[in-house]
C-alpha cells in the first residue's frame, strides 16, 4: 500500500489562530509516552503491577455471559464463600446448605466469667474438640480471668472486694470528720451534706460533714490573726499598711511586695503577688 503523499508547506491550510512558526511537531510513534510530573512519587500499593495474581483476578471488572448474569472469576469461586452483598458471588442454588456451626460454649476459650470453668466434654463425633491455647486462670476461690490475686482484700485499691461481678465495689457511704478540741463539744458544729450519686463522681451517695463558720479553716484574708505566730515583722507591716495608710498599699512597691506573698502562693496561684 502506497504511503499518502505529503502536501508541501504552502499547500497546508492555515487557521487564523495558528502561530506563524507552524503546528507543533508530532512525537514519533516509537518515542515513549511523556510521564506526568507525579512519576517521582511512589506508585500506590493498589496499582495492578503491585498486586499478586490472585488479587488481580479478584479485582477484575464484572464479566457477563450471554444471559446477562454475572460470571464468577475462577479464583473467587474457588476460594471464597458467597456473601450476600457482593454482586460477583451468587448463593448456592442447588445442593444442601452447609450445616450451621454449633454455638461455642461460653466457658470455652479465653474469656471466661467463672473462676474455675469446667472442661467441655459434650462434643459430638463429627466435631473435633476445641483446644484452647490460653493459660489457665489463677488458682483459688478469688481468682478472676484478668486480675491478679489481691494481697489485701480490704484495701480500696483492690479490685476483688465485690459481692458479685455485677455489683460495684463496696465503698463507705459516709465520711465522718472527727471533732477537734478547738470545737465546742455539744454544738451543731457539723452539718451533713448529702451528695447524690452521679456519673461524674463514679461513686455511691456520700454524706460529708462540713465545718460551720466559727470553725472554718483559716482563709487567706484571715491570716493576720495568726501571723504573729509565724512572722511578727510581716504581720506588723501588713497591719500598718492596711490600717493607717491604705493608699500606700497600692502606690508603694515596698508594701505591695511585702503584703502576704507567702500565704496564697501554694494553693491559690492566681492570688500570688509579684516579688521584687
Curated annotation (Swiss-Prot):
Domain of life: Eukaryota
Amino acid composition bias (Basic and acidic residues), ranges on this chain: 106-126
Disordered, as annotated region: 1-132, 156-176
Family under the similarity heading: Belongs to the UPF0328 family.
Protein name: UPF0328 protein ECU03_0010
Species for this entry: Encephalitozoon cuniculi (strain GB-M1) (Microsporidian parasite)
Amino acid at each position: 500500500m502506497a504511503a499518502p503523499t505529503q502536501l508541501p508547506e504552502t499547500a497546508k491550510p492555515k487557521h487564523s489562530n495558528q502561530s506563524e512558526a507552524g503546528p507543533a511537531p508530532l512525537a514519533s510513534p516509537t518515542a515513549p509516552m511523556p510521564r506526568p510530573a507525579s512519576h517521582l512519587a511512589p506508585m500506590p500499593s493498589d496499582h495492578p503491577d503491585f498486586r499478586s495474581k490472585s488479587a488481580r483476578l479478584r479485582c477484575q471488572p464484572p464479566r457477563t455471559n450471554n444471559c446477562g448474569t454475572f460470571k464468577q472469576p475462577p479464583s473467587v469461586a474457588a476460594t471464597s464463600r458467597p456473601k450476600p452483598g457482593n454482586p460477583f458471588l451468587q448463593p448456592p442454588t442447588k445442593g444442601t446448605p452447609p450445616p450451621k456451626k454449633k454455638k461455642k460454649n461460653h466457658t470455652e476459650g479465653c474469656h471466661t466469667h467463672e473462676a474455675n470453668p469446667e472442661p467441655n466434654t459434650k462434643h459430638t463425633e463429627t466435631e473435633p474438640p476445641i483446644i484452647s491455647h490460653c493459660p489457665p486462670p489463677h488458682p483459688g476461690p478469688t481468682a478472676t480471668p484478668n486480675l491478679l490475686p489481691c494481697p489485701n482484700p480490704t484495701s480500696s485499691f483492690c479490685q476483688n472486694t465485690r459481692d458479685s461481678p455485677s455489683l460495684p465495689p463496696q465503698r463507705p457511704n459516709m465520711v465522718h470528720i472527727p471533732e477537734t478540741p478547738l470545737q465546742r463539744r455539744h454544738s451543731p458544729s457539723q452539718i451533713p451534706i448529702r451528695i447524690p450519686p452521679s456519673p461524674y463522681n463514679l461513686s455511691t451517695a456520700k454524706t460529708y460533714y462540713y465545718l460551720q463558720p466559727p470553725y472554718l479553716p483559716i482563709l487567706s484574708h484571715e491570716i493576720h490573726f495568726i501571723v504573729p505566730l509565724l512572722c511578727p515583722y510581716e504581720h506588723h507591716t501588713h497591719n500598718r499598711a492596711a490600717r493607717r495608710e491604705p493608699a500606700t498599699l497600692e502606690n508603694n512597691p515596698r508594701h505591695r511586695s511585702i503584703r502576704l506573698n507567702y500565704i496564697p502562693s501554694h494553693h491559690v496561684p492566681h492570688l500570688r503577688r509579684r516579688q521584687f
